[in-house]
């Protein structure tokens, strides 16, 4: 294995290997993959960072599985409090893991309505109080930030509410892997207080499609085996080594002046926004 024997029309077949001696194993990593993940952990400033070759969808299921494992025993039917603009991967996870969802809806006058679904800390606190009045305690709070229009939630304020209620905050940060590398300082969910977070590296970083990160904050007590088992539960036993190698190569990119390059990119985007607004006011969304 693989059947192409390292030869084929694409030209990348020689890099497409499987779990052989010296190549490590993603869900039991202790060699080169574990070392690469340790490098990513340092780059992102997290407690622990793990690789996925099946996108944030795999990470979403894994972090929800971990959150369910952390809930108190005999806590009743599990329910998750989630902003309504969640990706369908959350719905698939709810079906697989058998939990209920209590939606957080945007305010009636919120700009962007359902696509952005801004959630204020006060609204989250009220929603938690309403659930408590029903005798229900969610096993976590789930946000999508940034959303599909680039809106970033007040993760710091929302995480403070979650932690005051003893709940973990889970963030789908699929579109925001770059947020840790902003020149003015990190706006990544983990640094803002999130407990579990996923990034689709392939969306905003130089990584092959399917490459994603599962990040853990310092408050998550799950051991190494539990996290890897959670990922393995929803992943293929034949993870793509091409995707893994592209993630490792991206580590080198992130470590080599990436903040400065990202700042130049943001400046160019700002110029483009101003030019578009000059053509028609409101045509370009503001940068966040």
Label each region the model flagged.
Residues 5, 21-24, 30-31, 123, ...:
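Solvent-exposed, flexible loop/coil residues
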Residues 10, 16, 35, 54-285:
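Conserved PLP-enzyme active-site core in the AAT-like
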Residues 12-58:
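Conserved N-terminal alpha-helix of the aminotransferase class I/II PLP-enzyme fold
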């Amino acid at each position: 294995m693989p059947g192409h024997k390292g030869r084929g029309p694409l030209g990348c077949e020689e890099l497409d290997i499987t779990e052989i001696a010296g190549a490590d194993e993603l869900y039991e990593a202790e060699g080169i993959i574990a070392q690469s993940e340790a490098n990513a952990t340092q780059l992102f400033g997290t407690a622990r960072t793990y690789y996925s070759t099946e996108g944030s969808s795999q990470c979403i299921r894994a972090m929800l599985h971990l959150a369910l494992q952390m809930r108190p025993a005999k806590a009743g039917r599990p329910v998750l409090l989630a902003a309504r603009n969640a990706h369908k991967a959350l719905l698939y996870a709810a079906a697989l893991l058998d939990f209920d969802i209590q939606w957080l809806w945007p305010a009636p006058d919120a700009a962007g309505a359902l696509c952005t679904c801004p959630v204020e800390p006060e609204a989250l606190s009220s929603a938690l109080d309403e659930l408590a009045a029903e005798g229900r305690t969610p096993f976590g709070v789930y946000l999508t930030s940034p959303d599909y229009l680039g809106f970033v939630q007040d993760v710091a304020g929302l995480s403070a509410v979650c932690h005051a209620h003893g709940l973990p905050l889970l963030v789908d940060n699929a579109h925001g892997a770059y947020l840790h590398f902003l020149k003015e300082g990190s706006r990544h969910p983990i640094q803002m207080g999130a407990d579990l977070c996923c990034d689709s590296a392939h969306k905003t970083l130089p990584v092959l499609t399917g490459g994603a990160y599962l990040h853990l904050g310092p408050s998550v007590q799950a051991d190494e085996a539990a996290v890897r088992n959670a990922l393995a539960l929803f992943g293929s036993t034949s993870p793509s080594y091409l995707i893994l190698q592209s993630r490792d190569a991206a580590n080198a990119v992130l470590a080599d002046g990436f903040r400065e390059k990202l700042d130049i990119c943001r400046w160019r985007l700002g110029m483009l926004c101003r030019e578009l607004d000059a053509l028609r006011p409101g045509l370009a969304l503001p940068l966040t």
